[in-house]
Amino acid sequence: MRVIRDTEAIKEQLLGCGKTAVALGAFDGLHIGHRAVVRAAAESGLTPVAFTFRDNPAEHLGGGCRYLTTMEERLRIFAEWGVEAVIMPDFADVAGWAAERFLNVLRFGLSAQAVACGADFRFGKFAAGDAAWLARSCAQRGAVLHVVDTVCYK
């Protein structure tokens, strides 16, 4: 499994992977909801990729949260789930991106034809992008978006 930390080098480091299905999220503990997002990406028949962060976004946004699993554990679990590449920049490096720039990285850097995220996924500067915005933008560009509902354990 490839681990890519430099967002400027994504396209070069994914050479040979072809078109991708990208699972988006902080993936703080890799629970069954996260697995559903990765599974939705993998079931598309494209190269499964996860886009997450080396550090928890909540740490930068005043939440003070930590990951429930270590980076090594997350990478091992992603590999077990069949993810072929993990894009894992520092959150600070992408926090200022406009939602449109984030979409362009997915489309052109990752060659994403399918994207999967949770219903509560937010992205872009000031969390300007959400699942509804992403759905419209993907549809306009011929990509498929899978929004995974929140999973509750009873």
What are these regions (language model features)?
Residues 1-154:
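Nucleotidyltransferase catalytic core that binds NTPs
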